[in-house]
Amino acid sequence: MKNNIITLTQSLIQRPSISPDDQGCQQLIAERLQAVGFKLEWLPFGDTLNLWATHGEGKCIAFAGHTDVVPIGNESQWTYPPFEARIVENMLYGRGAADMKGALAAMVIAAETFVKHLPNHQGKIALLITSDEEAAATNGTVKVVETLIKRNEKIDYCVVGEPSSATQFGDIIKNGRRGSITGNLYIQGVQGHVAYPHLADNPVHNALKFLDELTHYQWDKGNEFFPPTSLQIANIHAGTGSNNVIPGELYVQFNLRYCTEVTDEIIKTKVAEMLEKHKLTYRIDWNLSGKPFLTPQGKLVNATIEAVKKFTQIRPHLDTGGGTSDARFIATMGAEVVEFGPLNQTIHKVNECVNIDDLAKCGEIYYYILEKLFNEQ
């Protein structure tokens, strides 16, 4: 499988698919899958292209990934052209090499090889591929999941090919993620001249005690699977830019990465209580990016651990840290979900790269997971 994985990865990298532009990546994948009997369903939403490809019937084992990549930044800082896909000393360089065209290619080749060997396999193999993960993530996996739910189509197990490995290939399997919720808070005051404060009402001064309480509040202590919930102020702004004007409004944007000990409703209620306690006039808009999820040790987690040990000779660690991914949408279907892929040390950076031997092992691991889960049905 190794040569096929590397060749497909290079072909995908050579298509400059800056999110949400697919640039023909999914068509390339679709042609390979269709050639071995996969049924293809195109699910475009807005500016996003999505592919749902299936083979067989029954319990569904899905692979999920994205063809879109982040911008390259300053191209002059790249040692090798970001869309050339050059291999140097066993490292494949290019935007998307690690996040996540390499893992996506490994998934496609693993599924393709599996159905060639076992065309009448048990269950259903599916690939869910989107071009909207790196940017808004509004017309991609979330919309495909909504479509599947509406027609009572289920995913039982799902491997998301995000680059999960941290310092050594295979050291981390993500079996959950924290939730993410952002508050956009507008605290009202009365604008005026700084020389006449009695004729104004400074929202910055009024908010200081509230902000101190908000940033020091302990939401929970975490649990055996998740670290404690954390809150960070991301943006804050007030004033006109002039030094003689008391601002009329203070804008504060803050984000919480929260564990399963709290809910988004608990967070909203507590923040409202704090605001009322400090007698602030305010408006707050909430944006829930994703709820926390956890896949406990079971068939999928155990199969993934076994596969990683077999092909890397190390025992992976289960982890729920990091940012959000499309796994959060798939988890809402009740699926067992894990994320596993190559090293994440160069993702979104200049000179993004991946070890081609790691990509080959990715393919072997994905193939083994299919074997293991279908044999246990």
From Swiss-Prot:
Give the record's pathway.
Amino-acid biosynthesis; L-lysine biosynthesis via DAP pathway; LL-2,6-diaminopimelate from (S)-tetrahydrodipicolinate (succinylase route): step 3/3
Keywords, sorted A to Z = Amino-acid biosynthesis, Cobalt, Diaminopimelate biosynthesis, Hydrolase, Lysine biosynthesis, Metal-binding, Zinc
Q: Name one GO molecular function term.
A: acetylornithine deacetylase activity
InterPro entries named in the record: ArgE/DapE_CS, Bact_exopeptidase_dim_dom, DapE_proteobac, Peptidase_M20, Peptidase_M20_dimer, Peptidase_M20A
EC number(s) of the enzyme?
3.5.1.18
Binding, Zn(2+) 2: D99, E134, H348
Q: Which reaction does it catalyse?
A: N-succinyl-(2S,6S)-2,6-diaminopimelate + H2O = (2S,6S)-2,6-diaminopimelate + succinate
The cofactor required is: Zn(2+); Co(2+)
Q: Which SUPFAM superfamilies match?
A: Bacterial exopeptidase dimerisation domain, Zn-dependent exopeptidases
Q: How is the cofactor bound?
A: Binds 2 Zn(2+) or Co(2+) ions per subunit.
Enzyme active site: D68, E133
Report the Gene3D superfamilies cross-referenced here.
1.10.150.900, 3.30.70.360, Zn peptidases
Protein family (similarity comment): Belongs to the peptidase M20A family. DapE subfamily.
Task: Please state what the protein is called.
Answer: Succinyl-diaminopimelate desuccinylase
This chain's source organism reads: Histophilus somni (strain 2336)
